[in-house]
Amino acid sequence: KKMKIEVFLRQCFLSPNASLPNRHRPKWFDKVEIFRNLKSTIDPKVANLNIVYDEHFGPISDTFLKDEENVEIINCGNEAGSFLRTLEIIEGRGYDDDTVIYFLEDDYLHQEGWCNVLLEAFNLPIQYVSLYDHLDKYIDSGYDNLVSKIFVTDTCHWRNTPSTCNTYAGRMGQFRQDMHIHKHFSAASPDGISMDHAKFVELGRHG
């Protein structure tokens, strides 16, 4: 039986990170095109798209998502709050332990075939996986001494990493086991942004 992916796309129209000096997006950046890319690359045979829309900054009826199905409306106003609500939504769905939950923010491009690549990763001895190899691991001096183990699957190679930008996947059974950790590092955030790095360091301590 092939694993099923439940994608939880968290969609909003304001991010405090976007105002940081190193986060300026190019003029051609467009969340509508990002969404179209996701819809065109998702494989409906193995993946189901769920949208979590934060109406704090405006009603969904004013957006390109107004006619989409499988939408959960929340009202949080910050990333950590929306992540906590998404965790609660997932907890209430009754997914099987083998269901792959993919937390996705609204500004990631995907390549063709990403669903099968993501499922490939769960043949490795890992609990969580991200499709995003963040640039900070290569340019941030804080990672100068980072050592990563390399894993190989049929399609690509992977590395272990201490952070994911809160866009990552895991089996539902693993999320149930670690739910208190996932919740804590959002609930305890001092600035409304989940403490992703600290979370994955803590998860690493638990194996």
Predicted regions and their residues:
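Well-ordered, non-membrane alpha-helical segments in soluble/globular domains
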Residues: 24-38, 114-117, 191-202
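N-terminal anchoring/stem segment of glycosyltransferases
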Residues: 2-78, 89-95
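A short, conserved alpha-helix in the catalytic core of glycosyltransferases
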Residues: 174-177, 186-207
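Conserved donor sugar-nucleotide recognition element shared by glycan-biosynthetic enzymes
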Residues: 79-83
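Conserved catalytic core of nucleotide-sugar-dependent glycosyltransferases
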Residues: 109-183
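A short acidic (Asp/Glu
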Residues: 18-20, 60-65, 85-86, 112-116, ...
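Short acidic, S/G/P-rich loop/turn micro-motifs used as interaction or catalytic elements
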Residues: 13-17, 56-59, 107-111, 135-136, ...
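Short beta-strand-to-loop acidic/aromatic patch adjacent to the donor-nucleotide binding site
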Residues: 97-109
